């Protein structure tokens, strides 16, 4: 779901979905507004799910803790900052910054929760991070005009991106908030997923809305009219926007919430990079973006490095299921034996 963001965001905001030079059908704050829509749709869907599954009472009994609130607040602010960043700086920088999030999550979990992490898990995380750099053409052969180089430009301003430094700051914030959200989602594993999801998305709306409001306030105060929200969507744009809000909102972020609740931070963070190959596949199939040697290497590294925690989780799940069946069978046998003893 998260890997489909480039498809639906381009569909929902661009004047021409396949031509970035045509610009956007809105102002620079449109990214925060799109993130706000994703979170608002999440609230609607999880409220419907809560009523449909008869968990209103569970929601009322669930104690709202800082971890639940901050998990939602952080993801809302992260995605609002990320989409805004892609409009003000290079896509390479924006992607590089937000994908520091899983690494930040792992470090926070190691420091504050003392989660054990094996050398193999660290190796897998490093592999998928390097794979992300290759996949996004930030690192690799022929990058930056070199035989082998790194493309990471920290210039405060360029002719193409006059507000580049601001965009880089938004990108850095998106990574910090993303990592913090993943970290906070690892708490309160006892909380019902549906009930927690309602709270998460409510606070995510607050987070994304805060970024959108601040951009408008700063825009009006400094005279940067391009920061003041303007929307000129066509019917075609609205279809893409709604698909973004649904598929990349309650569906994708709901799965992210479930993963954070059930997986250790290291496995959670490693698997999070799998959205990169999905985005690259969308770029190839829909936008005819070429698959270079670097992107191929990136996909192989991400899939290979991410396979370990995925397979491990599947094996553990299978073992737990077998143990549960054995326990149930043993319990039935004991009950049968007890019944026979009573008959005697």
Regions found by a protein language model. Give the residues of each.
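Hydrophobic alpha-helical transmembrane segments of multi-pass integral membrane proteins
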Residues: 1, 26-49, 124-130, 165-173, ...
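Hydrophobic transmembrane alpha-helices of multi-pass small-molecule transport proteins
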Residues: 46, 50, 117-156, 294-313
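Specific transmembrane alpha-helical segments of multi-pass solute transporters/efflux pumps
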Residues: 1-8, 53-93, 98, 134, ...
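C-terminal transmembrane-helix exit sites in multi-pass transporters
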Residues: 101-123, 133, 277-296
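Hydrophobic/small/kink-forming positions within alpha-helical transmembrane segments
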Residues: 3, 7, 40, 72, ...
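Glycine-/small-residue-enriched transmembrane alpha-helix faces in small-molecule transporters
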Residues: 1-36, 73, 77, 81, ...
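C-terminal-most transmembrane helix of multi-pass membrane proteins
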Residues: 35, 39, 137, 237-239, ...
